[in-house]
């Protein structure tokens, strides 16, 4: 419990449970012998990378920040966990100003504005659909990441 409410003020059990549900932490908590009271090793080494990521999202959700800064939120997770992380991010970022650094474009395709950086400079900006239509660097990166999934060029 302490690990999720860390830094949150007066977090109720209902808020804790709601955060665990929308960030997909509930199955993890249910598997743990002591549930929310399960001891967490230093740096969370007793959890997988994906589990640590989802726990950090639950923690952020109960703190109710106005601004989120996310750096490679889906890095180092398997495909199944990435889907859970993406869904959790959707809930976490709703109604908040979010600055997201990402190489996996699936993490940012639904945001209001994307800034594409190349060699330290912003070279493109726009929404996902706009950037695909421009057929620039973002489009090329998207092709590299997703064309193989459909067996053809995307967009």
Q: Residue locations for each model-derived region?
A:
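ABC-family ATPase nucleotide-binding domain "signature/switch" substructure
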Residues: 2-10, 14-25, 35-135
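Nucleotide-activated donor-binding/catalytic signature segment of Leloir-type glycosyltransferases, i.e.
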Residues: 29
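C-terminal boundary and immediately downstream tail of ABC-type ATPase nucleotide-binding domains
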Residues: 133-155
């Amino acid at each position: 419990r302490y690990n999720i409410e860390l830094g949150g003020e007066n977090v109720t059990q209902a808020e804790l449970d709601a955060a665990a549900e929308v960030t997909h932490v509930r199955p993890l908590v249910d598997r743990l012998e002591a549930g929310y009271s399960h001891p967490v090793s230093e740096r969370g080494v007793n959890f997988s990378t994906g589990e640590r990521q989802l726990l950090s999202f639950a923690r952020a959700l109960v703190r109710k920040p106005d601004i989120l800064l996310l750096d490679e939120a889906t890095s180092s997770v398997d495909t199944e966990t990435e889907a859970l992380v993406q869904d959790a991010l959707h809930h976490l970022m709703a109604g908040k100003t979010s600055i997201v650094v990402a190489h996996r474009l699936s993490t940012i395709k639904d945001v209001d504005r994307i800034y594409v950086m190349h060699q330290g400079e912003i070279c493109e900006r726009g929404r996902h659909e706009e950037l695909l239509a421009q057929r620039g660097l973002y489009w090329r990166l998207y092709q590299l990441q997703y064309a193989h999934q459909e067996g053809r060029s995307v967009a």
